[in-house]
Amino acid sequence: MTDLKLAAQRALNLMDLTTLNDDDTDQKVVDLCRKAKSPAGLTAAVCIYPRFIPIARKTLREIGAADVRIATVTNFPHGNDDIEIAVAETRAAVAYGADEVDVVFPYRAFMAGNEQVGFDLVKACKEACGDKALLKVIIETGELKEEALIRRASEICIDAGADFIKTSTGKVPVNATPEAARIMMEVIKAKNPKVGFKPAGGVKDAAVAGQYLAMAEEILGKEWVSARTFRFGASSLLASLLATLGHGDKPANTSGY
């Protein structure tokens, strides 16, 4: 298997296959779940809005893909600083059956100088997840922009108990970048290598995915790169990976996540 095909296969098995669109419907989520059981194997998870968790669970079970985890989003996409609402949404997501919750860090409050609300929100949402769901925290690196802010936000999230730190919502102009990824993974290495990393948005093909995988291996080691600690958040990536692996045609360039 070529290096590119190897990267494509690994990326597929590490993917949180995502639909987070305003026009999502039950049928679109059913279709997404069916895609998660691909000709080249299962994706790690699907990532959907909370209201679709029951239909996703039912569909994955029916198609023999119950091992695909269900991730959802809370405090999304704006990262407000109302802890009570973020916790209520997270608790509801877990009650609905989410295996993983991707919560948005209150990055604007943080940029305005309030570190405490971010720490408190992540800590409270982690408590709401208990031992039932992983907590993945989106720090919105494309808005933070500065290395020092990306580094500090990553540190706060890890200190507050995040299971993963994630670059982006996919709802702002700049999503995952290699520069932000390096900073975040360096913080993980320094503070707690059990914490996972998820680049989201902007990972368009096997070559780009391979760059992130190589960087993760360089910083944290080959053994670290598994679905337990590394995911790609993506929607259009899957078709490109399947084409690289010989399943279907390469898609036209698509924008967005």
Curated annotation (Swiss-Prot):
Active site, per annotation: D102, K166, K198
Record-listed E.C. numbers: 4.1.2.4
Subcellular location(s) of the protein: Cytoplasm
GO biological process, one term: deoxyribonucleotide catabolic process
Single GO molecular function: deoxyribose-phosphate aldolase activity
Pfam assignment, any one: DeoC
Gene Ontology cellular component annotations, sorted alphabetically: cytoplasm
Keywords: Cytoplasm, Lyase, Schiff base
Catalytic activity line of the entry: 2-deoxy-D-ribose 5-phosphate = D-glyceraldehyde 3-phosphate + acetaldehyde
Gene3D superfamilies per UniProt: Aldolase class I
Family annotation (InterPro entries): Aldolase_TIM (IPR013785), DeoC (IPR011343), DeoC/FbaB/LacD_aldolase (IPR002915), DeoC_typeII (IPR023649)
Pathway(s) annotated for this protein in UniProt: Carbohydrate degradation; 2-deoxy-D-ribose 1-phosphate degradation; D-glyceraldehyde 3-phosphate and acetaldehyde from 2-deoxy-alpha-D-ribose 1-phosphate: step 2/2
Cited PANTHER family: DEOXYRIBOSE-PHOSPHATE ALDOLASE
Summary of the function given for this chain in its UniProt record: Catalyzes a reversible aldol reaction between acetaldehyde and D-glyceraldehyde 3-phosphate to generate 2-deoxy-D-ribose 5-phosphate.
Family according to the record: Belongs to the DeoC/FbaB aldolase family. DeoC type 2 subfamily.
Name under which the protein is recorded: Deoxyribose-phosphate aldolase
Organism (species): Aeromonas salmonicida (strain A449)
